[in-house]
Amino acid sequence: MRISKKKNTNLNRRTAQRESYDLVLIVCEGQETEPNYLESLREHEDLSSVNVVITGESHSDPISVVNHAIKIYEERANEKNPSTLFDKVYCLIDRDEHAKFDAAVHKANTYTYKAKRNILTIVRSYPCFEYWYLCHFKYSRAGIHKIGSKTAGDACTSLLNPLWQTIFGTKYTKNQSNVYPKLAHLIQIALTNSKRALQDTESSSDMNPSTEVHLLVEYLLNIKNSPTKK
């Protein structure tokens, strides 16, 4: 399910059932781009909205994402019901120009260390989530930086737009829905390019551009094979 401040009137979500695989919480920095993509993946791959909970209600700041993830996780933990406790919690954050990016990563790592179990997983994108989309069309490790009044994230979107328009005939917008099924035929290309870019960061020591989104996507594509408690 998607956690929202608004009342959910969707019948399918109200009647969704817990399935016998991991319970996972995904907290997104954006309110539209990442949740829209992940919700369309969940629906396309027929994953339960009870098992895969997605929220974009954390405000557009990496440290807020981590704080919100901890809050939701601890609310579940306080229920003292092992069957409803999240097995994994993912925090999606963009590097872009966020001043508290490193602080968010540090807080997540510290929380996990103190808990003595692997609770929070940070999924970083440099400069932004749209680089994951770019990986569906081509491999590129050319740095994506601020240009004039454009943020690095805006610059990444500008690189994505002509490729998007060639395939789909329309400009890319952050609030597009059903993105995953549109790109599904290119998913193996995206996984290959994203892995290659992340591997290259190890030798170049430059994270821009790269993303860890493929780690989350592969996990979700294989989640039905995960052994868990009922």
Question: How does the language model describe each region?
Answer:
Residues 1-4, 63-65:
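Membrane-interacting alpha-helical segments
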Residues 2-4, 9-23, 36-56, 75-90, ...:
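C-terminal accessory helical subdomains adjacent to catalytic cores in phosphodiester-
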Residues 21-31:
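N-terminal "first-domain core" detector
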Residues 30, 34, 58-69, 208-212:
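Phosphate/oxyanion-binding active-site loops and adjacent basic polyanion-contact surfaces
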